[in-house]
Curated annotation (Swiss-Prot):
The lineage of its organism: Bacteria, Pseudomonadati, Thermodesulfobacteriota, Desulfovibrionia, Desulfovibrionales. This is Tetraacyldisaccharide 4'-kinase. Belongs to the LpxK family. ATP binds at residues 53-60. It comes from Nitratidesulfovibrio vulgaris (strain ATCC 29579 / DSM 644 / CCUG 34227 / NCIMB 8303 / VKM B-1760 / Hildenborough). Transfers the gamma-phosphate of ATP to the 4'-position of a tetraacyldisaccharide 1-phosphate intermediate (termed DS-1-P) to form tetraacyldisaccharide 1,4'-bis-phosphate (lipid IVA). Keywords: ATP-binding, Kinase, Lipid A biosynthesis, Lipid biosynthesis, Lipid metabolism, Nucleotide-binding, Transferase. The gene is lpxK. GO terms for molecular function: ATP binding; tetraacyldisaccharide 4'-kinase activity. One of its GO terms (biological process) is lipid A biosynthetic process. GO terms for cellular component: plasma membrane.
Amino acid sequence: MHVAALQNHLAPLLVPCSRVYAACMAVRRRFWESPMSPAFRPSRPVVSVGNIAWGGTGKTPLVDWLLHWAGTRGLNPAVLTRGYGAKPPTVPFLVGSQHTAEEAGDEPLMLARRNPYAAVLVDPVRRRAGRWAEHELRPHFYLLDDGMQHLAVRRDLDLVVLRPDDVLDQWGRVLPAGSWREGASALKSATAFFVKSSPEVFEALAPVLEERLAPYGVPVFSFWLRPSGLLRVGGNEQRPHFDGAPYVLVSGVGGPGQVGETATRYFGYAPVRHRVFPDHHPYGPDDVRSLAQEGAQLVCTPKDAVKLERFAGLDLWTFDLQTVFGPAIGTAAPFPQWWDERWARLARERAGTS
């Protein structure tokens, strides 16, 4: 039985537990946000990118876009991330392009390679990593990855990523009766909301987005991932497409359905097979042998590529992905323009308090 169906079936038992859990999380939030809490406030601005629900929502592409934005402006940011599944030799662990996904985690390694001017720090205690960066690196600003519930580091801006389902069937459904980590009151902290969806889906969602998110008084932006080409994993070769040849899609991410839609839209035809692995899957030799026997071109996500590149002899391609912003609610400005203006205001505010 699917998790959501099981939660619906057990709702009479789970809903009371959810209310208790949501109340505990609200108390926790009030404690960490109080002036008396031991939360760490760096001397430079902190931008949190997080989500209300568990699972993949598109946080990493948004973090990647912000890092690219910083690089084009000569800014050196520091990313504070837990590094899901990482086994770093020391903490905090400053990720470099030479490290492995096992050491750094798949997403931190991908971010570090795509943005070499950024300091990507893996540490389950992000407050400790922030203090280390404050002393050793002096970054221009901090990005708190998956930071909505990580309140031990104070933030100036809270960018909250939502899935379409979060504003539909899962709205307000807190663990264990739903997928939300906190109750709807936590959304009051948001500086802006983001929904990873195509413009068509976002337009269809607009009425419910306005009804449920308008009370928070902040803009809602849409974004999606658009491939600009294919890159050979472990090499430098590039190509635009497979010339109509069949392909097998490989993904171990939180939203495999969206990966399939992206691939089909890019190639103009669906994969002959979609090999779906769990999120953050640690690929092993058996997986690679199975993939090598597929008999078609193999294409994977960049997140999977950093884990599969170590296997020699696997003819594998990955997407060169770009984050694209679309329609918005609550502002006439496209997100890049809104962000430039919001960042300039934050920089002035922090300069005035330093």
